[in-house]
Amino acid sequence: MKNIELKKFFNEDDSFEQNGKMIYLVPLKEFMKTEEFASFSPVSRKDKNETTGETSITKCQFLNSSAWTDVHPHMIIDKTKSEKTIKYVDLGEKAVGGEFPNIEYEIMVRVNEDGTLNRDFVREVKKGRFKNKEGKFVDTWYYKKGYEHFCPVEYPRYYRDPSF
């Protein structure tokens, strides 16, 4: 699907003006059908099965960041070849149903008037490392400012604990 076709999802209630241009929120599931989304490079996530010892590799296009009791979704838009540094944009959310505390959310993407991804707030995060017992460096997930943990996922989720 071409990005311009996202215009059918534009809604004045889900839009705002920023630096003289309109920004629209469209559902992530629709943005994932575009050619632009298909051009983003995924990040590899290695998972080791502790019982069998086998390692599986999953290609991930999203990050879930967790800090305290909140999980926030992000979309990966670029990476270095070694995947030590990745660039991402934050995804928004919109309440679409349910009642407190069981509110249902839909994940939204910020796009420009022509349907292309809004890149005004591209952020960067680096892979964390630690030394194991043998003195070798082991890469872990991604960290920012030492407290926010970023985990690559196939599809993002949103969660906020209202009791915190």
Task: Enumerate the language-model features and the residues they cover.
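Mixed-charge, low-complexity intrinsically disordered regions
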Residues: 2-73, 89-164
